[in-house]
Amino acid sequence: GGGPLTYDFDRSEFWRSIPLWRNVDSKTFGDFRWQQRNSVTSIPGIKEALCELASSALISDIEAGLLKTPMNIRLTPYIFSRIHWENFENDPIRRQFLPLGSQFVPDHPQVMDDSLAEDVDKATPHLTHRYPDKALFLPITLCPVYCSFCTRSRVVGGSTAVKSKSAYGAKSKEWDSTFEYIRNHPDLEDIVISG
């Protein structure tokens, strides 16, 4: 009691189990720019990363999942390497980022694109003001990874087979109206910045 909290981080080179990154050193692998540049964003990217680990059944199941989901895929090598590919059907990380066609269930009849009704309370193109002292500022639409169940899949990650998306692409010059709105609402005390 009373001492600093410590965490036992995994110091192993776990990514070496993925054929594409077998020869990547820890300094390179730990570089966030390298992670972004080498993100897996397609079926060919999955095949390239996994090589012999990618069975045709796995690839077909992921392809079937991508035909049903409104979100594209984007996984950094770090996240991709954390998936236990020997038991991919049940892996919780895979479930979060890579949908399988075999695991889809029908949508609820009242499913909505904007399930959190953020657009209803939009004060500016990039600011949702729902509560008197709180607002949500969405300055960008790029995430380092794309979660398959993202509540903003209607605007993030580009169009898919089942969802056509307009180019949201927030730009800094478009933020002026948001900053002006915030300045004109001194009751706002808490601004959540998200993507």
Q: Predicted segments — roles?
A:
Residues 1-130:
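Flexible, acidic/Gly-rich N-terminal and inter-domain linker regions that tether
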Residues 141-145:
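Cys/His-enriched microdomains
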